[in-house]
Amino acid sequence: MKTLYIHIGCPKTATTSIQYFCNENKEILSKNGIYFPIFEQKYKDVNPYRNGHFLIAHQYDSNGKINTLDEHRIFRFNMDHIIYMFSKYNNILLSDESIWHSTHFFKKDLWEILRKESLKR
């Protein structure tokens, strides 16, 4: 069974430490069938090991307006990578401490979006 684990990391629960630990131990995780991806997209003031940030992050254009086309492009690119990596791994781990909050406010449909993505495999 293929599983996408999403660590939603509530504040002050050592989420950053978990993310650094997963990155530092990627090879060990990999040998045990767990893939912890680091994506090319970087976000200002966001540590690069918050690999689930693309699930909830806004993208902005040069005028400071939300760029939904760019958001969809990055989401699609990263989800396609995840779907591909399921051909090599049974378990994929994403982590971001903003997911717990975002799913209650501006990204309420995230779980439904991910459920639909799971049907594409």
How should these model regions be labeled?
Residues L119-R121:
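Conserved phosphate-donor/acceptor-positioning beta-strand/loop module used by diverse small-molecule
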Residues M1-W100:
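PAPS-dependent sulfotransferase catalytic core
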Residues H72-D80, F105-R115:
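Well-ordered, non-membrane alpha-helical segments in soluble/globular domains
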